From Swiss-Prot:
Pfam families, sorted: CBP4
Gene Ontology BP term (one): mitochondrial respiratory chain complex III assembly
Residues annotated as transmembrane: 7-29
Domain of life: Eukaryota
Purpose of the protein: Essential for the assembly of ubiquinol-cytochrome c reductase. It has a direct effect on the correct occurrence of the Rieske protein, core 4, core 5 and apocytochrome b.
Annotated GO CC locations: mitochondrial inner membrane
PANTHER family (alphabetical): ASSEMBLY FACTOR CBP4
Coiled coil regions, renumbered to chain: 78-112
Keywords recorded for this protein, A-Z: Chaperone, Coiled coil, Membrane, Mitochondrion, Mitochondrion inner membrane, Transmembrane, Transmembrane helix
Membrane topology, as annotated: Single-pass membrane protein
Protein name: Assembly factor cbp4
Gene behind the chain: cbp4
Organism: Aspergillus niger (strain ATCC MYA-4892 / CBS 513.88 / FGSC A1513)
Broad class of the protein's primary localization: mitochondrion
Similarity comment: Belongs to the CBP4 family.
Length: 116
């Protein structure tokens, strides 16, 4: 066989692989509805209940990623800073709740002692 024939065969095989492979994968891949129908009824119910929550969480995550990417810093540093800020806020809230509980206990103690 001539060189041109070999090149044509290789070109044909390459096209079949490059076009046919992804087309075959797309053909055998099940759709979301088909996968959902394969779930057992409990999983279908839970999936329907949690779908909105998961969509909201994903949207919030994408929004945070967009905010972090606007920063000059690396996304990882921006995420770490936000996590540290949340930790500090949670600690402040815990301290505030502890102080409020302490004040309430003192008021209750004063009421009890004042009535006796």
């Amino acid at each position: 066989m001539s060189r041109a024939g070999t090149w044509m065969k290789m070109l044909g095989v390459g096209i079949v692989i490059c076009v046919g492979g992804p087309a075959f994968v797309q053909y055998i891949r099940p759709t979301d509805e088909e996968l959902f129908k394969r779930y057992n009824p409990d999983l279908q119910k839970r999936s329907l209940e949690e779908g909105d929550r998961r969509a909201r969480e994903f949207d919030e995550y994408v929004t945070r990623l967009k905010q972090w990417s606007k920063s000059d810093k690396s996304i990882w540093y921006a995420a770490q800073e936000q996590q540290e800020q949340k930790r500090v806020e949670a600690e402040v809230q815990r301290n505030q709740a502890r102080d409020d509980a302490k004040v309430q206990r003192e008021e209750m103690r004063k009421e009890l002692l004042g009535e006796k």
